[in-house]
């Protein structure tokens, strides 16, 4: 029960404005037949859709809030409500049988009452023909039907679908809230701060947290950066011995480049006496380094690191790109180590 | 190849096959869609040609009934139906599966007037 | 919840409810059977959302030997619960649900403990309090279903045609089904007129399942309609079916009002001829037979020609032929289905042209039952 309650609150907490908007639409009976909810993963798209379903079905409304505890609410949250039909891609795409099931459900009356809600997750993973075949139902549904199509980005959807739905863009979650959420999942606050600088997407964050990747990456890059900024050319070796093991694929490689960039940004922040930095744990060392170098040098570091992501996207080899950058950084700080 | 690799491989192959099958399904429905669109365009084209004819030959005294007592426009529909597409209100422009006859279409073309 | 019951009665009721339970479902709890014990009765429910079956066993039922010690409800996985109950050793069984929905089933020396689910998560069937209650003879209604369901479409691309369209107006209940290749329509007269006209589409699959449950022991069946479900009640059983939403196409214009050729015959005679002719048409590539009518000679010939296999020709025994000569081709399977639905009776077949649908009606009752078939164009 406890975590079920949490889920109710998530729509309200993550997207309070959207929830308020839906509340008004329901009160004034201006709910449309089809919505396209867009926004990054973990932003609360499904929470919002389920919240609306609960708002419509709840038998114990608390003011304008679903109770989250009645039979209707709990069945919606656990995906067991026969009149709240949920579809998510089975593997790479939404399969032909799934679309068949959806169409059949669209053409039948509700099981328990006249009202039906459809939630289609990652709706962009429908094939063009599948999406087109659903158009008819979205456009002129029979009965009290509300369909939610969820996608990260509206540009991923067919224009025919976009033009027939009301589009609601969900706002990115506030950073503080995300950090709080992560620390609740036993992620150290310093790591949480770094993670939220890398991405807003909770599923990406999960990937980065898995197997302690972020922890290992933080350690490896800390050693690499400190070594490089003392002008010590052994930082070049660190790339092979420490960094490469973490750069499993393009996704991780990009994140490594982002993490490197964040060091350069921290140095600049400190040089200009800014309070918040990413690598709070290394504040003392970074402050010292910032004090000892001039702005020109720090900008040079940023200049070295900035183009790396672009180079990577042009299929240049990750290791050689990073090694080259390492040598350049060492050169900038050559005088300092001696 | 040890057993686990073998197993992984077969899983991989199965997955690939599934993907391929899905793609086939997609391609198939895409093709049907294009055919249907094509049919609709044909109808439209026919209509346009008809209009063109009417416009250029103003002396033409209305639509003459011809074969089976069908008017020109009904003949067009008949032609379209014969080439495998629905002409009825219910499924207009859709491909007739397996060339099965459709009572709705036949009523539109030959029905009582 | 705790009760004892005679196993025979329980199994019989369980079998009825199990018709609605499928092991393939998107909602896990629907693989389950809901058992609910009230003060004076036991209610079993199964549902695949399309149909839901609820049946009641009363404590007054002498054969059931039902004794309810405490009330409550639980959902048990239908497949293995059914298997367990069927294999229990004794004539009676005891079922008890403890905290956390753990369920103990005891019979003779055997005791099973299985995990149940919260019955609150089971779909809630709507209360149907419609003013219109239609009472029908079970055998007549079952016949009506079987006569019309043959023409229901099995293509999901046209969901609305997968149902039978029922309209009730005055004292007439009419059922129509068409897959656009053929059409069946049956009308029955109700003992008294209905106040509010009704218009619903019930999935053919649901109705087939219903007609299988209507055995000789069942005399009458009632139909009630709510906003989202049709409810059929017979004996102690409630049978719910979801409806198909949308507008059913206007089928009345499909039926030709006039005819140019008419032929009368006994259904079994033509059926036998068609069955023989279709032996070849099935073997060939296009499943078509041809009917050639020579009105002057009162002669009707069925022929099938499959270039790869061979050909067949036979003269049909008819009672009468009037009108113009005609050559018409059609899918013999549609005619077979239609003729079978008539049984042993005299039929009138009416044609307007080789291109338009033709109709079959019983000579005795030409108003209330019609089968329509679309010819195949052969040019």
UniProtKB/Swiss-Prot annotation, chain B:
UniProt binding sites for Zn(2+): 86, 88, 102, 105
Domain of life of the source: Bacteria
Cofactor(s) needed: Zn(2+)
Statement: the UniProt record of this protein carries the keyword Zinc: yes
Keywords carried by this UniProt record: Cytoplasm, DNA replication, DNA replication inhibitor, Metal-binding, Zinc
InterPro entries from the UniProt entry: YabA
Localization terms from the record: Cytoplasm, Nucleoid
Chief location of this protein within or outside the cell: cytoplasm
One GO biological process term: DNA replication
Cofactor note: Binds 1 zinc ion per subunit.
GO cellular component: nucleoid
Pfam families, A to Z: YabA
Role played: Involved in control of chromosome replication initiation. Inhibits the cooperative binding of DnaA to the oriC region, thus negatively regulating initiation of chromosome replication. Inhibits the ability of DnaA-ATP to form a helix on DNA; does not disassemble preformed DnaA-DNA helices. Decreases the residence time of DnaA on the chromosome at its binding sites (oriC, replication forks and promoter-binding sites). Tethers DnaA to the replication machinery via the DNA polymerase beta sliding clamp subunit (dnaN).
Family: Belongs to the YabA family.
HAMAP family: YabA
Quaternary assembly: Homotetramer. Interacts with both DnaA and DnaN, acting as a bridge between these two proteins.
Name the record gives this protein: Replication initiation control protein YabA
Organism: Pediococcus pentosaceus (strain ATCC 25745 / CCUG 21536 / LMG 10740 / 183-1w)
Gene symbol of the encoding locus: yabA
């Amino acid at each position: 029960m406890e975590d079920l309650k949490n889920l109710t609150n998530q729509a309200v907490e993550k997207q309070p404005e959207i929830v308020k908007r839906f509340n008004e639409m329901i009160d004034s009976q201006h709910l449309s037949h089809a919505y396209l909810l867009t926004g990054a993963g973990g932003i609360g798209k499904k929470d919002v859709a389920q919240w609306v379903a609960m708002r419509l079905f709840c038998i114990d409304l608390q003011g304008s809030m679903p109770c989250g505890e009645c039979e209707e609410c709990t069945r919606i949250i656990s995906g067991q409500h026969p009149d709240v039909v949920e579809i998510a891609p089975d593997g790479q795409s939404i399969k032909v049988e799934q679309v068949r099931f959806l169409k059949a459900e669209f053409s039948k009356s509700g099981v328990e009452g006249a009202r039906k809600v459809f939630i289609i997750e990652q709706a962009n993973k429908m094939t063009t023909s599948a999406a087109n075949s659903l158009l008819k139902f979205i456009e002129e549904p029979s009965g009290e039907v509300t369909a939610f199509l969820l996608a990260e980005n509206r540009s991923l959807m067919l224009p025919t679908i976009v033009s027939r739905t009301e589009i609601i863009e969900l706002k990115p979650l506030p950073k503080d809230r995300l950090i709080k959420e992560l620390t609740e999942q036993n992620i150290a606050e310093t790591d949480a701060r770094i993670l939220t600088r890398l991405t807003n997407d909770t599923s990406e964050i999960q990937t980065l947290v898995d197997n302690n990747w972020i922890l290992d990456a933080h350690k490896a890059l800390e050693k690499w950066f400190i070594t490089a900024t003392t002008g010590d050319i052994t930082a070049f070796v660190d790339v092979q011995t420490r960094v490469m093991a973490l750069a499993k694929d393009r996704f991780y490689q990009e994140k490594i480049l982002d993490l490197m960039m964040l060091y350069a940004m921290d140095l600049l922040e400190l040089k200009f006496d800014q309070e918040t930095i990413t690598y709070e744990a290394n504040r003392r060392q970074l402050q010292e380094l910032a004090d000892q170098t001039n702005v020109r040098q720090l900008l040079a570091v940023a200049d070295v690191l900035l183009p790396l992501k672009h180079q990577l996207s042009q299929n240049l080899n990750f290791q050689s790109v990073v090694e080259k950058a390492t040598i350049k950084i060492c050169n900038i700080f050559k005088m300092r180590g001696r | 190849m040890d057993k686990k690799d073998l197993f992984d491989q077969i899983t991989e192959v199965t997955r690939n096959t599934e993907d391929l099958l899905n793609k086939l399904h997609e391609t198939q429905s895409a093709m049907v869609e294009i055919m249907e669109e094509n049919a609709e365009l044909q109808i439209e084209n026919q209509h346009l040609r008809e209009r063109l004819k009417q416009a250029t030959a103003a002396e033409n005294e209305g639509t003459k009934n011809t074969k089976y007592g069908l008017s020109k426009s009904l003949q067009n529909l008949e032609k379209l139906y014969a080439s495998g597409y629905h002409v009825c209100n219910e499924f207009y422009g859709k491909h007739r599966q397996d060339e099965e006859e459709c009572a709705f279409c036949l009523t539109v073309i030959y029905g009582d007037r | 919840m705790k009760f004892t019951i005679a196993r025979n009665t329980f199994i019989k009721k369980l079998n009825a409810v199990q018709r609605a339970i499928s092991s393939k479902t998107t909602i896990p709890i629907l693989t389950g059977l809901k058992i609910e014990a009230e003060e004076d009765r036991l209610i079993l429910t199964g549902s695949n959302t399309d149909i839901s079956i609820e049946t009641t066993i009363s404590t007054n039922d002498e054969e059931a030997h039902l004794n309810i010690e405490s009330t409550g409800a639980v959902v048990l996985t239908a497949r293995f619960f059914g298997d367990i109950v069927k294999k229990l050793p004794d004539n009676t069984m005891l079922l008890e649900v403890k905290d956390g929905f753990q369920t103990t089933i005891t019979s003779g020396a055997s005791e099973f403990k299985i995990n149940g689910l919260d019955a609150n998560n089971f779909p809630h069937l709507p209360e149907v309090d419609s003013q219109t209650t239609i009472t029908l003879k079970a055998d007549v209604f079952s016949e009506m279903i079987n006569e019309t369901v043959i023409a229901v479409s099995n293509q999901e691309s046209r969901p609305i045609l997968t149902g039978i369209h029922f309209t009730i107006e005055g004292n007439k209940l009419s059922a129509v089904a068409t897959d656009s290749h053929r059409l069946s329509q049956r009308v029955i007269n109700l003992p008294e007129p209905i106040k509010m006209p009704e218009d619903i589409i019930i999935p053919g699959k649901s109705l087939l399942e219903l007609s299988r449950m209507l055995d000789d022991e069942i005399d009458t069946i009632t139909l009630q309609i709510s906003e989202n479900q049709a409810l059929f009640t017979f004996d102690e059983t409630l049978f719910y079916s979801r409806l198909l939403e949308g507008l059913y196409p206007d089928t009345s214009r499909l039926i030709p009002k006039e005819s140019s050729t008419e032929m009368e015959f006994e259904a079994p005679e033509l059926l036998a001829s068609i069955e023989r002719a279709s032996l070849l048409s099935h073997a060939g590539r296009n499943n078509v037979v041809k009917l050639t009518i020579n009105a002057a000679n009162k002669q009707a010939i069925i022929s099938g020609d499959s270039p790869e296999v061979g050909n067949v020709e036979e003269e049909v025994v008819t009672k009468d032929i009037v009108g113009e000569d005609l050559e018409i081709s059609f899918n013999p399977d549609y005619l077979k289905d239609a003729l079978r639905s008539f049984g042993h009776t005299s039929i009138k077949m009416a044609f307007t042209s080789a291109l338009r649908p033709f109709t079959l009606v019983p000579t005795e009752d030409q108003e209330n039952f019609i089968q329509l078939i679309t010819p195949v164009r052969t040019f």
